[in-house]
A protein has these predicted regions:
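Surface-exposed amphipathic alpha-helical tracts and adjacent flexible/coil segments at the periphery
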Residues: 1-20, 24-34, 47-50, 56-84, ...
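Short glycine-enriched, charge-decorated loop/helix-capping segments at active-site entrances
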Residues: 34-40
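Glycine-rich, highly charged phosphate/nucleotide-binding loops
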Residues: 41-46
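Conserved nucleotide-cofactor-binding alpha/beta core module
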Residues: 122-123
Length: 704
């Protein structure tokens, strides 16, 4: 049966989820999880939570799905070790350094690829399986048919979101909160700037980045039928009563193999919605109807929530059925066997019955006494008593027999498996290169690549794979190197075409492929190209670099959320690069932000490269409440990539040159060809030039 996975932001939410039918819960423990402002659990609370869940047949998944620094890795390793000791069933991960650490420290604990890994193709799931992960959580943006294709062919379990908040950006790729306010969504501190007001033509008069919550209750049975192993409910930041309501309804749908009633749909909306729900992504649709905000006048349904709370607080909505077999014989210790439905069986003995001096106890009276399981997590589903005639046994002895049996059964159900433990070993310290970094450039338009730019000295030109046919590679390849940048988001159906484009790119002179997602590894396998990691791999620590080296990468771009000291201190086992100029990418979205507002005849065509007459060809600008303008660029497949309104500028700062970087990237997006040349000359100290509206990004302030 498909597992129902519910959020547990605290102890009350945990009880609400379990009592209302969750098969598993996911929770945070310590500070290393994607919802750091949730209540989460202390050591004692986490151990108690695991016991509470396991006693009732519920699994516990720990969320360690954030990016961590080298300094934080030892504490994370200790957190994971304790979680393993407490019996956690699996751990969700995003950071490749965390993955490497957990494989070494707790090799027997199953790992799940978090949605923060942005897995959205079969190839990505297959790569996760190759690395030993047992489950992959798919991106929320996939359609039902795309989920089916992956679930039916995947070598590991597939988990998908069924209900709750939708991020505007693909999870794990959003930098908006980090860049604007220093609160990183990749480190569990997202400030949700997507819920604020934005607009066009200089006005912030709408909410074009605020998606409605997903509601796939009508498709729960369909997803179970297609082989989805787990349906996930979002909501670790929501109220416990919300968790109770949504869990209860979805549990009933899965258990009873039916569609939701009109009343159940009404209750889901009453529990929480943003002006209704959406199932657009699941149905393979995009558009303005998917967007909404929670009205300021919205109120929690306190009366109904009070009823829900009163029910789950009794903690008797979910009891473990047990079968009793009791035998009472004169002069022999009483024997009671207890068995649950999960294969656990215990036998305990009690005092020996004596011959009755007056009225003898009956089998019915013994059964009635054994069935009194109030205050425990058990209920007696069947009780068979074999008792000789004429026996006397104290009620206290029967109570003790029952308690002993249930205690023994509880011990079996909450038994912690024996697991191996390894030692955390920090990455080997490698001395930074002392030479200043060489400059690479990435372009967005073919016209940005000119003789003037190349003649200034460019180590490598990064070109989007779909743009390469428009670039004169042959003209410049004797003077610079070319790297084909794979799309950040694509689909399984695109992969044959992408491989063919890569082969063509290599034949034309592109020596390198740039990877930004786990699924890219499968696309480039066997092509014999140099491989570099892009910023999408979220390299935040030395262990992640070591992992990428083991996967065959010859270089990697470090996360632009790192401060310059953190960039410097990473142990660079392979050549490293950092973005030191340009508009930083804030979001990549499945919905085309521009087409939603202005319409576009290419919207349904899923174009690879931007078309000259498309709505996004001119990089229209989204405006926020303070007048900041954010250019919106076309991304592969008619998606949108939102850029920062200010341009990262470090030409006048010496620190990046002393950070041990082999390459420093200039990221060109909206610049003219002339501006590209001036920027490169300025970074090389050949021209006095500073663009307007600059920022130092996160180079000095870092992120929470």
């Amino acid at each position: 049966m498909t597992e129902l996975l519910s959020p547990a932001g605290g102890r009350e939410a945990l009880v609400a989820a379990v009592q209302n039918g969750a098969d598993a819960v996911y929770m945070g423990f310590g500070s290393f999880n994607a919802r750091r402002s949730a209540r989460n659990f202390s050591d004692e609370e986490f151990l108690a939570a695991v016991r509470y869940c396991h006693l009732r047949g519920v699994k516990v998944y720990l969320t360690l799905n954030t990016l961590v620094t080298d300094r934080e890795l030892p504490a994370l390793a200790e957190t994971a070790r304790r979680a393993s000791e407490y019996g956690v069933d699996a751990i969700l991960v995003q950071d490749w350094g965390v993955y490497e650490t957990l494989r070494a420290v707790i090799p027997d604990v199953p790992l799940h690829a978090s949605t923060q890994m942005a897995l959205h193709t079969l190839s990505g799931v297959e790569e996760a399986a190759r690395l030993g992960m047992t489950r992959a959580v798919l991106a929320r943006e996939l359609s039902g048919e795309e989920i089916r294709e992956i679930a039916e062919r995947a070598p590991i379990e597939i988990e998908t979101f069924a209900h709750g908040a939708l991020c505007m950006c693909y999870s794990g790729m959003c930098e908006m909160s980090a860049v604007i306010g220093g609160r990183s969504g990749n480190r569990g501190a997202c400030a949700q700037p997507c819920r604020l007001r934005y607009g066009w033509h200089g006005k912030a008069d709408a909410n074009p980045l605020s998606l409605k919550d997903a509601n796939l209750a009508a498709y729960a049975g369909e997803m179970a039928e297609m082989g989805v192993a787990c349906l996930k409910l979002e909501g670790r930041m929501k109220r416990s009563e919300y968790v109770a309501a949504v869990t209860g309804i979805y549990a009933a749908l899965l258990r009873e193999h039916r569609a939701p009633t009109a009343d159940e749909q009404k209750k889901l909306a009453l529990a929480f919605s943003r002006d209704g729900f959406t199932d657009g992504y699941y149905r393979g649709r995009r558009g303005k109807e998917m967007f909404g905000v929670r009205p300021e006048t919205a109120r929690w349904p306190e009366e109904w929530f009070g009823t829900l709370r009163a029910a789950y607080e009794k903690e008797d909505m979910r009891l473990v059925p047990v079968r009793f077999r009791a035998a009472l014989r004169l002069g022999e210790p009483m024997v009671l066997t207890a068995e649950d439905g999960d294969g656990h069986c215990v036998t305990v003995t009690g005092v020996a019955p004596e011959a009755a001096r007056s009225r003898a106890v009956t089998a019915g009276e013994v059964e009635a006494r054994l069935r009194k399981t109030g205050g425990t997590a058990f209920t007696v589903s069947d009780c068979a008593v074999t008792a000789e005639d004429g026996l006397s046994v104290p009620a206290s002895a029967l109570n003790a027999l029952r308690r002993d049996a249930l205690a023994a059964l509880e011990a079996l159900r909450t038994e912690i498996p024996e697991r191996r433990e390894g030692t955390f070993v920090p990455a080997e310290r490698i001395k930074n290169p002392t030479e200043p970094p060489r400059f690479t450039v990435s372009i967005y338009r073919a016209g940005q690549l000119t003789d003037a730019l190349v003649n200034e000295g460019v180590e490598t030109v990064y070109v989007p794979l779909e743009l390469l046919p428009s670039v004169e590679v042959e003209k410049y390849r004797e003077r610079t190197r070319f790297a084909a940048v794979l799309p950040r988001v694509w689909r399984t159906a695109d992969e044959e075409g992408l491989r063919e484009q890569l082969r063509t790119a290599k034949e034309r002179g592109a020596e390198c492929a740039v990877l930004g997602n786990l699924g890219h590894f499968a696309l480039v396998r066997g092509l014999d190209m140099e491989l570099r990691g892009d910023f999408g791999l979220n390299v935040f620590n030395s262990a992640a670099l070591r992992f990428l080296q083991e996967q065959g990468l010859s270089g990697a771009t470090l996360s632009f959320e790192l401060r310059h000291e953190q960039l410097r201190d990473i142990s660079k086992c392979i050549p490293c690069e950092a973005i030191v100029y340009g508009r930083l990418p804030l979001m990549i979205t499945e919905n085309c932000i521009v087409a939603n507002e202005f319409g576009c005849r290419h919207f349904k065509g899923r174009c690879g490269a931007v078309c000259a007459d498309s709505a996004c060809a001119g990089a229209p600008e989204l405006t926020d409440r303070v007048g900041e303008r954010f250019p919106v660029l076309h991304a592969y497949g008619c998606r949108s990539e939102l850029q920062n309104g200010k341009t990262l500028w470090l030409a006048d700062k010496p620190e990046y040159r002393k950070s041990g970087l082999t390459y420093a990237r200039l990221r060109f997006t909206t610049e003219s060809a002339e501006e590209c040349v001036r920027v490169l000359r300025a970074y090389k100290g050949r021209e006095e030039y500073t663009p307007k509206d600059i920022t130092r990004g996160l180079f000095y302030r870092g992120v929470e």
